Amino acid sequence: MYAFVLSFCLFFILFVDEMKITKKIIVYVFLIIIGIWGMQQRITYITLILPIVLLIFDKTGLAKNKKLCNIILHSAMWLPIILFILGITGKFNILAMDSYVKEGYVSNSAGKMTEDTRTFLYEEALSSAVNNQYLIWGRTPAYGMDSPFVQSFDDAGYVGMALTIKGKMPQRICEAFIPNIITWCGILGFLIFFLLFYKFSYRIINKSNNIKLRILGLYMTFFWIGSFITYPSTSISSDWIIVYLTIAISSSPQIMKLNDKEFALLIRKATT
């Protein structure tokens, strides 16, 4: 629940200057509450980094530099794919932080910050795709990936963790978007989502007529990076709502043509 509200608060903080004082107070109060009681998962800390970076771009005027924004766009879109290839080839696994971070960081609420909880998800997703011959096309959202991890829990008596049962191997979905999309839609689906994020991020950054929309374009590129470790898309998520809201905005020629003052007026009317 905290994470759901946090994403909306961090989204609205980008437009807080255009809001009336009462709406500003509401956003700040929610942020304070979440900061005190809601920091219970590592992804929450990661989620906080994104709006801070975007706010810096907004307040310092860096977002006005279209060339810099395009460099960030292309780097952010290709970096996780490069790291993904390095990981599956065994050359470098960025998720195994203990291998290159000498001292493990421990949070009272989130536990060990360097613990790798994602590598085995990719191992299960890829091995299931290869073994069942659906690596290219996927096996549709009606199925999950074959999971020896869930099998071990079922063998120990924890029944009901699997999404479905096909044969003897339990299947499941996971808390990261990319392993799920590989399972459901294969490499083809992965490429489609890559192009979706690439197209709309590029469109917003290069075709919009105001800075706030350009920042939303940068938001989508960072969301693409985050989809490799979270954003499962298996339930209603504030993060996905914001992404599709951004896509809808970029699909509106009228909104894309608004200058900074006109867009600020639109936000003020929308939050009245």
Predicted regions and their residues:
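Hydrophobic transmembrane helix bundles of membrane-integrated enzymes that assemble
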Residues: 1-105, 167-271
